[in-house]
Each structure stands twice: as C-alpha cells, then as structure tokens.
C-alpha cells in the first residue's frame, strides 16, 4: 500500500517534464524538450533539457510510512544557435513556467561555445502529495 502512496514522488520528474513540454511547445516553435542528455543523430535547436538533480523528503510524520511532500531541484539547460535575444526569449518562457508553478528560480547562467548558446538555471519548491501542478 505504501508503495502506491509514494509513487507520485518517484514519478514527479516525468510529471513535471510532461507539463513543461506541453507549455514550451505552445510558446516556442520547434523546441525539443527532453530528459535525455544525449541523443543519436544531428542536434536539434532549440533544445531544453530537464534533469532532477536533487530532492529531499519534506513534511515527514512520526510514522514515516509515506512521503507527504518533497523538495525537488531541477536543472534546466537550454541550447540554441543564433542570436542572444532568441535564447533569452526561450529562457523567459521556461522561467515563467516555473514561476507560475510557484518554484524558486536561481543560478541563471548564460554561456556560448562554438556558436552554441546555453542558458542554465535551477528551480526548486516544496510540493505536497495532494497538490497538483497547474496545467498551463
């Protein structure tokens, strides 16, 4: 029984990625949203990579049989060829998604290497087992 009650926490990255993919595809033409760091073939631009890089249990009860809440941290990496304004526009949409879902956004870093621009940031929040992320 506890296994079923805790499955929401272990599948949270997939849930968030699915919502983010839907949101980004409706705002940025041709974007590839993925959880896979590597893919075979020619790179696709723009690409948004979602990785859960950490997560702790929150709201633990004395019984501690179920996960009541988690505090996941996601790292978002956006890559694109082209103008700085283009990737910044994509980053604005991604940050807006996380802010609408009540995440804290931090560590926004922009780089360029071999004509490929990258924007990376992190997003974190506490979410309870009965909460639902808004479907934007």
Predicted regions and their residues:
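Small/polar-rich, solvent-exposed N-terminal microdomains that initiate assembly or binding
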Residues: 1-62
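Beta-strand secondary-structure signal
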Residues: 49, 71-77, 120-122
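Beta-strand elements of well-folded, non-transmembrane domains
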Residues: 54-56, 78-82, 99, 125-129
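Acidic-leaning, charged glycine-interspersed low-complexity segments
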Residues: 89-136
């Amino acid at each position: 029984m506890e296994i079923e009650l805790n499955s929401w926490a272990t599948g949270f990255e997939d849930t968030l990625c699915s919502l983010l993919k839907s949101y980004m595809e409706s705002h940025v033409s041709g974007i590839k949203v993925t959880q896979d760091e590597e893919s075979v073939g020619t790179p696709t631009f723009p690409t948004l990579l979602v990785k859960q890089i950490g997560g702790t249990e929150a709201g633990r009860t004395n019984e501690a049989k179920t996960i009541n809440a988690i505090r996941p941290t996601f790292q978002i990496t956006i890559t694109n060829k082209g103008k700085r304004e283009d990737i910044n526009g994509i980053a604005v949409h991604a940050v807006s998604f996380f802010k609408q879902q009540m995440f804290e956004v931090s560590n926004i870093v922009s780089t360029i290497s071999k004509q490929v621009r990258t924007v990376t940031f992190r997003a974190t929040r506490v979410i309870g087992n009965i909460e639902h992320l808004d479907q934007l």
